């Protein structure tokens, strides 16, 4: 039930954020927004899993999301590492780790795992990032 709710919420958020971006963008080639921190809302995950998720047609993303929930190992210092899968982020605070890609951005954000909530390095769509405090 939790996965169904999270998956449905992710789909609604993804659709809503796409519409909002389309309404606010003036078209043309806008310069890439640079920021060091902010918030992220949408689907994100381990690099390989997130690439697989984005490569799927929209109709197959729901099933992929449900079948590939994020899982990570936890270090002695309390950090998530060696992650696989994807997760839904709801206005999570983040710090930019790598913004060299045009469509995605690698961030450090807290993710909810079976063991609790831990900081992890994940990839999200650039359009899902809101810069600022």
Language model segments and positions:
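N-terminal signal peptide c-region/cleavage motif recognized by signal peptidases
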Residues: 15-19
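Bacterial N-terminal signal peptides that target proteins for export
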Residues: 1-8
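Repetitive helical segments and hydrophobic/amphipathic motifs
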Residues: 11-12
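N-terminal secretory signal peptides
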Residues: 22-82
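SH3/SH3-like beta-barrel superfamily modules
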Residues: 24-33, 83-129
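Generic preference for well-ordered secondary structure
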Residues: 6, 73-78, 91, 113
């Amino acid at each position: 039930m939790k996965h169904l709710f999270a998956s449905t919420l992710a789909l609604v958020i993804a659709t809503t954020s796409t519409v909002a971006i389309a309404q606010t963008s003036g078209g043309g080639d806008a310069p890439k927004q640079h920021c060091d921190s902010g918030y992220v809302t949408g689907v994100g995950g381990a690099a390989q899993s997130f690439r697989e998720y984005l490569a799927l047609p929209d109709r197959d993303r729901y099933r992929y999301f449900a079948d590939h929930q994020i899982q990570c190992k936890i270090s002695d210092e309390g950090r998530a590492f060696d992650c696989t899968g994807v997760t839904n982020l709801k206005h999570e605070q983040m710090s930019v780790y790598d913004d060299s890609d045009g469509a995605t951005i690698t961030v450090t954000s807290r993710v909810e795992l079976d063991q609790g909530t831990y900081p992890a390095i994940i990839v999200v769509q650039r359009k899902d990032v809101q810069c600022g405090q």
